[in-house]
Regions:
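Short active-site oxyanion
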Residues: 54, 77-78, 128-133
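Secondary-structure boundary motif
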Residues: 46-50, 95, 124, 128-131
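Short, surface-exposed amphipathic charged segments that create phosphate/polyanion-binding patches used
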Residues: 30, 93-97, 171-172
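A broad, structural surface signal
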Residues: 3, 38-45, 91, 120, ...
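Carbohydrate-associated surface elements
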Residues: 83
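N-terminal glycine/serine-rich phosphate-binding loop of ATP-dependent small-molecule kinases
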Residues: 1-76, 88, 104
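Gly/Ser/Thr-rich active-site cleft segment
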Residues: 102-176
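Hydrophobic or amphipathic alpha-helical targeting/insertion segments
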Residues: 73-74, 92, 96-97, 101
Length: 176
């Protein structure tokens, strides 16, 4: 969407639309982040051709993430929240942290695909991946990194993550 103020009204114009279909590789459902970035860059080019813009906003599903190595390279395509790898994981976590405590800290609905459960799954099932990772970026921040080369974390999404309390406390996104 390309939005602009005309007088005191906000006008929005769709300039490009693309599907966001996950891909299955070896039985795992992944975000097709490479194709998405291609389409996002295409959208930016189309917006520039229509007169440009002052800012870009990235809005996407908040629970999925990418892991970067020490050189800033994406270690694997982000696993899609619809992948069943976290089935049963919340119950394992609740044995360690009561669900009431998780809800009290985050205020978000306890869904099996939340970031906390995805990270717990990785810690249990793929610990080498987390050990080798240098940084963790949620999807909007990962996309912003691919566009700008800057690694930043959006505090609005901190509530979705372990360590974030929804009150401005920044969770640690470095894995090392």
């Amino acid at each position: 969407m390309l939005s602009r103020f005309e007088g005191n009204q906000l006008k929005a114009e769709e300039i490009h639309r693309f599907s966001n279909d996950p891909v299955v590789l070896n039985g795992v459902l992944y975000w097709d982040i490479v194709r998405m970035m291609f389409e996002i860059k295409r959208s930016i080019s189309l917006a520039l051709a229509k007169g440009g813009f002052d800012a870009i906003g990235i809005d996407t599903w908040g629970v999925d993430f990418g892991l970067l190595d020490r050189r800033g390279n994406l270690m694997q395509n982000p696993v899609h929240y619809r992948d069943p790898h976290t089935v049963g994981v919340p119950e394992q976590v609740f044995k360690i942290i009561p669900k009431e405590e998780i809800y009290k800290k985050t205020g978000i609905q306890l869904m099996r695909f939340n970031t906390l459960y995805q990270l717990y799954y990785l810690a249990r099932e793929e610990p080498a991946l987390l050990t080798q990772a240098d940084q963790f970026l949620l999807m909007p921040d990962l996309m912003a990194y691919f566009l700008t080369g800057e690694k930043v974390q959006n505090l609005e999404k901190a509530v979705d993550c372990p360590g974030g309390d929804g009150e401005g406390t920044r969770p640690s996104y470095h894995t090392g």
